[in-house]
Swiss-Prot record:
Its main location: plastid. The chain crosses the membrane at residues 148-168, 213-233. This is Protein RETICULATA-RELATED 2, chloroplastic. It comes from Arabidopsis thaliana (Mouse-ear cress). Keywords: Chloroplast, Developmental protein, Membrane, Plastid, Transit peptide, Transmembrane, Transmembrane helix. Residues 68-86 have a biased composition (Gly residues). Pfam families: RETICULATA-like (PF11891). The lineage of its organism: Eukaryota, Viridiplantae, Streptophyta, Embryophyta, Tracheophyta.
Length: 339
């Protein structure tokens, strides 16, 4: 009996020596750790979301150990099917709106290396051409309406940069069609000529959606820009009481609604077409010729934009000229005298 007991004791020790004991995991060190169990009923491996991606956790219950992190099997991350870690969620920037803007800028530069050059040309050449087009559409080249021209300069500078930023493709939105809300989810997220497998209705949906966005931005920028320009004119009057503007200051709300209409219709169509043209030219032209074409296209685009805004402002009455009214009244009085 003693010999049999000794033999049994030795056999149990040899069996235990071949069993790999499970390692203990201290989950208190990482309170954000997630443990995932397979749905097939066998606990063969644990997939967690630790910072170390290659820790092996063998578990009792059969099967080999799976790896923790982005390379696990089953329902782990990387293979889909309910796992974690397939795509990292974007964290809010500690710098607030400025940090979000910097992240958005980097994302746009990553998607289009020519984006900084386009913005520079838009702000230098484009805004200047916009002001020239605005002045060319006014009597006496706008010299009698410099207050209106200044208002256009302030609002146009804000809007031109905003248009460039909103229409530029980003590294996140490049090739994506699910970034827009509601019924526009299947539409291109940047502009209607964005590369991708989109239908004609999808691209038209982007035109409509961006038009609503630009109209909203135009309304906000019109309110801010008109208030700034009118405030500066009032400040000038306080400093120099003899200063008189040749025209009445533009009504803030009416001028803002005019800008909203201009942005949602004219600017929306022009800038989306411009983005599509630049996309095609970048693929077919040498870099130097392409940059030259960018400058030329933006000059033409902004001259047309300035002229179209003056026409719309005249139609809505947001920028009425006092001298024109005086001339009309004098002509009427002269006709009455002749009669």
């Amino acid at each position: 009996m003693a010999a049999m007991a000794a033999k049994l004791h030795i056999s149990t020790k040899s069996d235990q020596s071949n069993v790999r004991l499970p390692r203990l995991i201290n989950l208190s060190r990482d309170p954000t750790a997630r443990v995932l169990f397979p749905r097939n009923g066998s606990v063969s491996s644990l997939h967690t979301n630790f910072s170390s991606p290659n820790i092996m956790v063998p578990c009792a219950g059969g099967g080999g150990g799976g790896s923790i992190g982005n390379h696990g099997g089953g329902s782990g991350s990387g293979g889909g099917g309910g796992g974690y870690g397939g795509s990292e969620e974007e964290e809010s920037s500690p710098w607030g709106p400025l940090g979000l803007f910097i992240q958005g800028w980097r994302s746009r530069v990553a998607a289009d290396s020519q984006f900084p050059f386009k913005v520079l040309m838009e702000m230098l050449v484009g805004v200047s051409a916009n002001v020239l087009g605005d002045m060319a559409s006014r009597p006496n080249f706008g010299l009698n309406e410099l207050d209106f021209v200044f208002s256009t300069l302030v609002v146009g500078s804000i809007l031109n940069f905003t248009l460039m930023y909103l229409l530029a493709p980003s590294a996140i939105s490049h090739g994506s069609s699910n970034l827009l809300p509601g019924i526009f989810r299947s539409c291109p997220s940047s502009h209607m000529f964005e590369q991708g497998n989109f239908t004609l209705m999808n691209r038209f949906g982007t035109l409509v959606y961006k038009g609503m966005v630009f109209a909203t931005v135009g309304l906000a920028a019109g309110l801010v820009g008109t208030a700034i320009s009118n405030g500066l004119i009032m400040l000038r009057k306080k400093i120099d009481p003899s200063f008189e503007t040749p025209n009445k200051p533009p009504p803030t709300l009416l001028n803002s609604l005019t800008w909203a209409t201009h942005m949602g219709v004219s600017a929306n169509v022009r800038y989306q077409t411009l983005n599509g043209a630049e996309f095609l030219l970048e693929k077919s032209l040498p870099p130097l010729v392409f940059k030259t074409s960018v400058i030329a296209l933006r000059v033409v685009n902004n001259v047309l934009g300035g002229m179209s805004f003056v026409t719309l402002a005249r139609m809505t009455g947001s920028q009425s000229v006092e001298e024109e009214k005086k001339i009309e009244m004098s002509e009427i009085s002269e006709k009455e005298k002749e009669d």
